[in-house]
Each structure stands twice: as C-alpha cells, then as structure tokens.
Amino acid sequence: MKKVPLQVCVSNKQCDVPIRIQSVKKLVLCCLQCWKVSTDQVYVYFLDDEALAQLHDEVFADPSLTDTITLPIDSPESTAHPHILGEAFISPKAAIRFLQDRAEDTDLLYEEISRYVVHSLLHMLGYDDQTPEERKKMRGKENQALCMLREKHALLSD
C-alpha cells in the first residue's frame, strides 16, 4: 500500500492573534519528523476562549479557561489506517494572558503559542503533566523541541 503524506489539518476560529496556517503545518511536521513519529493525520484548532471553555466543559465537565486541550486518538503504536494521532485545541489568547501575567515581552507571543502546539503533540504521544515529575519531564521535552524549531526557523511567526 502506497504511503500517503502526513496531513496536518489546521483550523483558525479565533481573531485574537493572526495564525499562519503554513507555519503551523511546518512546526508540526518538523516535530514529528524529529521525533520519528509516523502518522497519517494531525488536527490543530485555534479557538477563542469561549469556545475552548465550552469544549473544556463538554469533555472534562470543567467550564474554566484553559490554554490547550488535547484529544489523542490513535496511540503512536496503533496500526489503525488511517492513523490519526489526535486533535489539539489551542487558545492564542491564553498565551497573551500568560505573558501579560508574568510581565513578559509580547515579542514572545508566537514562541508561547508554539509551545502550546508542542505541548499538545507531546500529549498525543503519551506524555502527561499531572505530577511535578511529569511536568518537569514534559517541560524539558518542550524546551528541546523549541530549540530545534528555532534552529530550523520553524517556530510560529506573524
């Protein structure tokens, strides 16, 4: 059976931050290639706070604001065809709030949103962040990925 190229499906349903679809696709492809992950499809949705809070309530019975929601679909080891790694739902506005709360430079906005995409990809691969040890491990993987993406000029940008 002929291998079809990876589809990175990106949807932008928010108006808080301009999102370049091709930039998101490049980031996802770079990460998955670096991590040697084989899949057919990955979905990334950028939503406003209201839509993400509603989804958070529907999925987790928690209507509070969040920065990302990840719904893994097929485990990396699955032989499903087509193999769908998962769906990432991201609030760019959460990145704005995060940087403002810490008095960080808003020039880091796209790097922070890039971190959210990487974070979701790691969740799709089975990483978790429920305990301090898991959070530390995940943050380390995120930082490695951001360094790699910076070197490859694959961080999100405006």
UniProtKB/Swiss-Prot annotation:
UniProt entry keywords in alphabetical sequence: Cytoplasm, Endonuclease, Hydrolase, Metal-binding, Nuclease, Ribosome biogenesis, rRNA processing, Zinc
Top EC group: hydrolase
Broad class of the protein's primary localization: cytoplasm
Cofactor note: Binds 1 zinc ion.
Keyword Metal-binding: yes
Positions contributing to Zn(2+) binding: 119, 123, 129
E.C. numbers: 3.1.-.-
Pfam families in alphabetical order: YbeY
Purpose: Single strand-specific metallo-endoribonuclease involved in late-stage 70S ribosome quality control and in maturation of the 3' terminus of the 16S rRNA.
Family: Belongs to the endoribonuclease YbeY family.
Name used for this protein in its record: Endoribonuclease YbeY
Species name: Chlamydia abortus (strain DSM 27085 / S26/3) (Chlamydophila abortus)
